[in-house]
Every structure is written in structure tokens, then in C-alpha cells.
Amino acid sequence: MRALCVKKVCGFLSKLSLRSSISCRRYYGDKIPNYGSYRRGFSNEEALILRRLSEGGLVHARHLLDKIPQRGSINRVVYWTSLLSKYAKTGYLDEARVLFEVMPERNIVTCNAMLTGYVKCRRMNEAWTLFREMPKNVVSWTVMLTALCDDGRSEDAVELFDEMPERNVVSWNTLVTGLIRNGDMEKAKQVFDAMPSRDVVSWNAMIKGYIENDGMEEAKLLFGDMSEKNVVTWTSMVYGYCRYGDVREAYRLFCEMPERNIVSWTAMISGFAWNELYREALMLFLEMKKDVDAVSPNGETLISLAYACGGLGVEFRRLGEQLHAQVISNGWETVDHDGRLAKSLVHMYASSGLIASAQSLLNESFDLQSCNIIINRYLKNGDLERAETLFERVKSLHDKVSWTSMIDGYLEAGDVSRAFGLFQKLHDKDGVTWTVMISGLVQNELFAEAASLLSDMVRCGLKPLNSTYSVLLSSAGATSNLDQGKHIHCVIAKTTACYDPDLILQNSLVSMYAKCGAIEDAYEIFAKMVQKDTVSWNSMIMGLSHHGLADKALNLFKEMLDSGKKPNSVTFLGVLSACSHSGLITRGLELFKAMKETYSIQPGIDHYISMIDLLGRAGKLKEAEEFISALPFTPDHTVYGALLGLCGLNWRDKDAEGIAERAAMRLLELDPVNAPGHVALCNVYAGLGRHDMEKEMRKEMGIKGVKKTPGCSWVVVNGRANVFLSGDKSASEAAQMVLPIFCGNEMLEEEEEKPLSLCHC
């Protein structure tokens, strides 16, 4: 009995909860199919009107409208207008248009609602037709102004603005914002200056525009001129400073903010993360959570935190897992409307070495960008097999990013043939793909093939990237192939309009000419450079130093300091090398001291070896040995190898034999089969006439199996480098190649009997 009673009560409550829906169905009958689909977001009567409008039942729709009672003080036309706007915003524009036609009454607000619906749905022909026929106010004109700006028709927008019979601050702001959005900052500034009155929105629009169009200095000036700032203003400036890398100033401004919202916090957290200050990003997030007026993170906050956790690497992988757990437990994944949060989590796991977790996320929701992230991580770990397996899933899509990643992976592994095979199969290759292939050929020392591929790239109608040229110039410099370097320089001049003064490219040209022995050409390019960075100065100083032009190198170093550029460790390596090759001991010691004390640059092992070389070349072997004894670290084989080599140069020094033997003993303790060390000691003994010791050392080399790597030389003929090893029987072939180039065939016949001397490296 009790069970029956409970059942009846439950049935009653169920019926009661459905009374409204049932009564509607009884009144209109069950002839309306898919009634439920029209209920989403609408009341019963709104859904029924929408259905009738959709079916063309205008009489029924009008009947329903007339039956709607006046709701309190709300006029019926206001309600109808609100309903029309609601239909238009939710995608039922045709139904909204029919409603507009059947409405018993309309006013200008109704017309503006319909006009806005047309514009938002990009039905511009209908929008213009209505605009021409309807009564207009400032809102109507502003709606059409927005439409023109959204279409990128800035000039038409300005013309329409000039025709407006009346304007308000919203109209002015709409035009300013539209011009900025279309990249016309100059015109936007003119309109901004002409505004009769400005509000904070006007100022914020200009500040944001300057920040996004490389005008941070102008944004700073406007920010300083503003009498009234709001949270948007402050947040824009924080974002701007972070965007341009001045995180310290961004944080100072953030701390001064009178109020903050989630966007402000996120701007600063993101700024830390994108500038690789990952710990600071996480610490600021914790501070945000402790704030009295704590705010919930949004999607951008979580994305930045995920990248910060990934940036901290393997050691902080647990932190990333905790973040993911928080995302799930707090339901934050529901804010990931565009999938960017999921991608950032994949990146986080991949960067932290938890590739299985990244792969698991990918399997839950496959995404091409996430797939590329994991492929890159597999390749970085040298796991070609897993990268290939994942690549097979996206191979048919011919996505350039994934294909280029695999090409790069094969090249890194030295598998040039597979890389080139994939390169040839990829349709619609872009400049990045070509550059990766060319760079890989250079990396695998296939310099002629790399230069040939550049020619193919140009023939295909693609303009090489500056990075492409830089790679090839680097290869020309590495092989001292001046002809190839000049050829690339000519291609640059032909393919780059008005010779784009790219700093990296100019630096590469300076370096290439210097390494190829054309120091005057290098200096000519350097002297014409409008902008010079530290790399520019370093390339030229190193070039002069390697050519034995110590005075010019040191004078250029002084010019660099006078220009306000700060030297770095590479700069000092160049000037110390210059001093070493010219025997300028006092100057070298002064520079070494200034490096540490004046510029607070910690010397590296190369700097210490330069100082050893400086002392040794000046014949001060004992001082060089004492210098090594005072080093702030335990010397390795390169240090003792340098000293041993200097003993070979100074074998006449009375201390040479003892120093050489001590250096060799330490060197061979560290590296028992070090070939250069054995050979250097043999040379010292030979110079001193100690042939018995030399013979003993060579015998020891034989027992240990120590073999000196033969020196090599090369000559470029018809664009191809021909390499010859020391002691190679093909030396006569080298003679046949080189002599016609320098002497001509007739001279070759005359000099046929004379031996050919080649430079070895």
C-alpha cells in the first residue's frame, strides 16, 4: 500500500513538472515535428513562434504574437524586438527576417536589430538594402561602419563616416578600431587626434594598436598622457612590455596596478612563460590563487601554465601532472573551446619526457598540431622508429610541418637518401622545407649538393629565405670556397629587391668572406652596414685576427667600445687571438684582466688556451706552464695538448724538453691514445736531435695502435670539392687539376717534371 502511494506521488510530481509542455502540445496538437530541437535556449512560446516562422506559418505566427500579453511595463514592440534579436544571434536569421515582416509594429530599434543580424551573418546585400530604406540614427550608421571595417574596406569606411549626419564617441571609436584592425595606424592616429572628445576606450584602442604594430614607444607616450586609466589600459601595457621582452618593466607595472582581473594576471603569467621565465610564471599563479579576491583561471592562463611546466623539463614533470589533475578535477577542460589547452598539455608532456602521456592525450582527441609536437619530440630523442609510426597516420595529409620534421629527422640521423626521397615526394614545398633540406646537406658535408639544390629552388620560382642563404654562406666559409660564396652573394643580389639589409644575412656575408681569405671584401660589407650588432663586430674582429692583422683588429675593438656595444666572450677570443699571433703579451694580459674585472665575463677554456698560446708563441714556455698550474679548474687534454704543441714550436728553448715531457705525461694520463700528443712529443725530440727518444715514442705508438689522422687538402674544380689525404697516391691527380687553373696548359708542359706543393690542413 505504501509502495503504491509513493508511486502515485512520484507520478503526480512527474506530471506536474511536465504540465507546461503537455498543455502546449495539447493546444497545438502533435503535428509539430522536432518540437524539442526548437526548445533549446527559448521559452515554450518563443520556440513555437520560431517553428511557425520556419514552416512559413505566418498567420499562426502573427496569431501567437498577438496573444502574447504585455509583460509588466515592457511594451510589446520591445519584446518583439528582443525576440527578433535573439533569433538572429542564435543563427535563425531567416526566421528573424520573417518575424520582422509580420510584426504589427516596428520602431528604429527593431530596424537596427535586423540590420545588426544581417551584418553579423555577413548578408551584406540585404543589410545595405535595409539600410537605404529604413529610418536611421547614429546606431544604424555605426553598424554599417563596423561592417565595412570588418570587410577590410577602410577607405569606404572613412567615406561613410564623413557622410554621417551625427556621430558619437562610439562611432569615432568604431572607425579608429577598424582602421587599427586593418593595419592603418597612421590614419587611425589622424582620426584619434581629430576626435572632439575621447573616452578610455579610445585611448585603449590606440595603445593596443601601437603594441600590436611594433609601436611600443608610441604606446608608452599615450599611456603617460592618459589622465584616466582602467584595468584594460594597464593590462595592455603589461602585455606590450612582455611582448617586446621587457619582462622586468612589465612586472613593475603589474605590481603598480590599482586593480587586477583574470586577464591582467594571465597577461603577466603568459609574459613570464613566453619569455622562458617558467618558474616565475608558476610562482605568480600561486600568488594569484592566494589573493584575497582570488579569480578562477581562464583558458589562456592554463595554456601558459602548461607551457611553463613543459619548459621546466624532465625534473618538474610531476608539476605538469598535478596541473593536468587540477584541470580535470576543476572541470577547466570545459573552457577549452578551440582545443588549444589540449595541445598545450600534449606539448607539456612531450617536453617533460612523458611521451606516453602525450600520446595518450593524442589518442583521446587526434589533432594534427599535437601529432607534430610528438613527432618532433620522438625525433629529438633519436627515436626514428616511433616518429615514423606516428608520421604514417598523417602522411596522406601532406602537412608540410610533419613532412619537414621527418626530413629534418632523417638528416640529423645522417640518412640523406631517405630525407631526399621524402623531400621529392612532398607536394607544394615551401621555403622552410627547402631550407631544412639544404641545411641538412651542409650538415652532412654535401656542400656541392646543397649549392645545387639552391639553384633548383630558384628555378622553381621560390625566393630563398635569408636563413637559406646564411646556411650556404656558412658552408662556403667552412670549406674556404670563395667562388661558391660569391655565387651565393650574386643570387642574393638578384633575388632580393633593393638588397634587403637583413642583419643576420650581412653578418653571414662578412664571416664568409673573412673565412675565405677575402678580408677586404668582408670589411667593405661591414663598413656599409647601417646596423651592427655584437655578432657583426665579432665576425670582423675574428677575421682580421685570423689574417694576422692584429693592429686593425684591436682598433676595431676600440671602435666597437666607442659605439656603445658591449663585448662578449667571443669578442675577447678574437682580440686575444690577435695579440697571440702578433706577440702582444702586455696588451693580451691587459685584455684578459679587463675581461674579468671590467666586463664581468667569466673566461672559458678557449680564452685560457689563447693566453697559453700567447705566452708560448712569445717563447715564454715556463710562464705558460705556470699559468696552467694556476688555472681555477683541472686542465683537460686540450690544455696540455696546446702546451705540448708550443714546445714543438720552441724546441730550442732550454726548458722545452722538460716542459714537453711533463705536459705529455699529464696528457697521456688523461688520453692514452691521443695521437696529436704523441706526434708533438716526437717533433720535440726530433728538433732536439734526440732520435733515440723519438724512435722509442713511435714504437710506443705502434704498440698502442695510435694512428695520426692524415691531413687533408681540397681543391674546387668545376664547382666540386676534390679532397686529397696526406700520403695519398693520387697527389699527382691533384697536380693535374691545380696546375692548369693557376698556370695554364702550356706552363704545365714546361713544369711537368717539378713536384707540386699543396697546402694541408
Swiss-Prot record:
Give a Gene Ontology cellular component term annotated to this protein.
Answer: mitochondrion
Q: Does Mitochondrion count among this protein's keywords? A: yes
The record's annotation in Gene3D superfamilies points to: Tetratricopeptide repeat domain
> Which of UniProt's keywords are assigned here?
Mitochondrion, Repeat, Transit peptide
Using the UniProt annotation, give all residue ranges assigned to the region (Type E(+) motif).
719-749
The GO biological-process annotations, alphabetized, read as: mitochondria-nucleus signaling pathway; plant organ morphogenesis; RNA modification
Start-end of each PPR repeat: 76-110, 111-136, 137-171, 172-198, 199-229, 230-264, 265-291, 298-334, 338-364, 367-397, 399-429, 430-464, 465-495, 502-532, 533-567, 568-598, 604-634
In the UniProt record, the transit peptide is located at 1-28
UniProt region (Type E motif), positions on chain: 639-718
| One Pfam family, short name | PPR_2
Q: Which GO terms describe its molecular function?
A: RNA binding
Q: Which domain of life is it from?
A: Eukaryota
The places in or outside the cell where this protein is found are: Mitochondrion
Which family, according to the similarity comment? Belongs to the PPR family. PCMP-E subfamily.
Please identify the protein, giving its name as recorded: Pentatricopeptide repeat-containing protein At1g32415, mitochondrial
Native organism is Arabidopsis thaliana
Gene from which the chain derives: PCMP-E56
